[in-house]
């Protein structure tokens, strides 16, 4: 989607040769969506595109919401900012508070709405991060984010083992997000699905900018205060946010506080930037998943075992980073040093997990550009080194045991019973990459090569003096190439293709959760590897109409699959599937028609096992669970000074919940709406009133694949009315 969060109006002129409505949109039929209501809306959008393509010069329009395509630039390629048309893979940039004015900045689900190929599931569970999946990668995540590399302002949030926790990230200061869709191994290493980079709001060019935001509904309240300013070469921003409430379900109370500090100094040769994030969550209850019957009738109910065992989470996390950038006439270089720590106390139904984590990392890159025989060339290279040190202790969860006979693991009435695991887990990852690009006229050829090595080691303190030693180690490595080509069919339209590879290791948690319950590393679990073929087209196909279309085929070997063991209390274990095959396509369309912004995204996937056996059961040909075969979204925003009105639709198809394809989550369609004032006179007050899930549908917001006790579904929230008020002054940027 081509949008801009800039507050100043900009007049633009798109160079477009063909103003006719695309034939494939005019002939929109049932196959293009697969549902009557979304079908009508998608065809309505196609009709609006036809209108948008026939209206006069775009330069005569208010383009605060749509910038020229050449100006839509991303840095997710690990280079200086590039036009999306130069990239031989799917990439999206979302500017916050642009076409979708009035969002609350409360969750990634809301922020990344309408990005094709990207599924963000809000679990409505305060102990769980949203599930973020790109082209199905990441859908297996039991907690946190897997399979997708996540960064903020170039600082990795993903740990050395590939796991990402984003509960500590305050989105109040985020101004935009960039998504790289597809195999990211050649650029970032341990990531199968792609990359998400969050970009902070720019500092004011001068002056002082204080802001306060209040957001509330019946079960949650969010208070945020921020202040930003600049003086000469120095810029700064500080944001503090407090969240609290009872949650949309039984036993889902939460309370958290986050602080983010950001300071930058710009000199004649480059910049120096320091960032600090601190997060504390002393209360977060875990309501767990529900059965199909509960999803239909009482989706707000909590798992009785979670309530009995007082399942929840207490966490504190700090991240500190320092980044230096330097530029010269034909190149640039940057280096980032970061460190962090995370303290976790996590009672679950099957155990109590205590974790003390320390992390350290360095990322560097250098880029050089030049001309040779009328060819523009660009070379870049870099290195990433990360370390992760986890002191893990597991205890029996004895909550609810007071009225029962004493057990060996629960000799007292305290919640924390005897210790079952005490081990030191270390992960060290190192990667080197090089990227080359040659451009002549309308053709750009890109090649990338990366080598990675990830070393895991575990020291079992409980077996320190055991025969055979107490230290286990494993090392996983990969070389991941990528080759792509991009062709400018018109100045504002590009066709591209690529072949790429990916590599994804198990996390320390996935390796440590051994089905036999013993300490150490699961030596049977292998890294997941894949190869992607992709082709697509992106750009302006008619005046004001931006289209991003991609088709892809992904062959994966040793895919990591989660499962549960009966009577294990919901603990997640992992195994490898022999081979899986992913085929799919994704489409996004956005346009502006008079005072209205319109947009839609559609993702169609077919993911199957090709070689997968569990015991004597052959699962070849079965659908990979947890991945919706069809999902779509639409939005429309109407503006009339000083206000706006937005309506949104989201759709998810019926989705398998287990490897055998016996249990399914039903399909669903949700509607949201909001109305607000963009700026009330000179006071800077921006009130918004909205309704989520207008028709109060019962649906599965997330699927717990291969769960036991029939608890496959984490329900979404019912109808919720909310109020948001932002008071602030906007300075020049």
Pin down the residues of each PLM region.
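Conserved C-terminal beta-signal and adjacent last beta-strands/turns
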Residues: 226-228, 379, 497, 601, ...
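Short strand-turn segments of transmembrane beta-barrel domains in outer membranes
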Residues: 176, 183-185, 194-229, 240, ...
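Gram-negative outer-membrane beta-barrel transporters
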Residues: 366-368, 373-374, 439, 445, ...
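N-terminal periplasmic "start-of-domain" segments of outer-membrane beta-barrel proteins
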Residues: 71-103, 109, 129-133, 148
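Transmembrane beta-barrel wall of Gram-negative outer-membrane proteins
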Residues: 215-244, 249-286, 311-328, 360, ...
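Membrane-embedded beta-barrel scaffold of Gram-negative outer-membrane proteins
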Residues: 229, 323-327, 332-345, 488, ...
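Surface-exposed extracellular loop regions of Gram-negative outer-membrane beta-barrel proteins
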Residues: 284, 289-295, 387-410, 455-464, ...
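Short acidic/polar hinge/loop motifs at secondary-structure boundaries
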Residues: 148, 155-181
